[in-house]
Amino acid sequence: MAVICNTCGLPEDLCACGDLAKDSTKIIIRLETRRFKKKGTMIEGLDPKLNNLENVAKELKNKYACGGTAKEGYVFLQGDHRDTIKDTLVGLGFPESSIELH
């Protein structure tokens, strides 16, 4: 018996909720200075209900070999990764038109 998606009610093999969620998000990438003048890359605009933030953060931390965290609606990575993070997010399935660098 097929597993049913809780969001749309379709079987998981036909479900497109994850793709629709990635298309409708507006992602903002910016540099943030935290305590002791440490810089980090803040990725905001990710919906925690539609995207698994822990998995996104894990992929990004492995790619950039840095520490980071996933909280409600944002992912924070230690260090300045603004120059390459857009290409990585496109590789994870987010549309390039919805990603904005600040």
Swiss-Prot record:
One of its GO terms (molecular function) is translation initiation factor activity. Keywords: Protein biosynthesis, Translation regulation. It comes from the Archaea. CDD domains: YciH_like. SUPFAM superfamilies: eIF1-like. It holds the Pfam family SUI1. One of its GO terms (biological process) is translation reinitiation. Signal peptide: none annotated. Belongs to the SUI1 family. PANTHER family: DENSITY-REGULATED PROTEIN, DENSITY-REGULATED PROTEIN HOMOLOG. This is Protein translation factor SUI1 homolog. It comes from Cenarchaeum symbiosum (strain A).
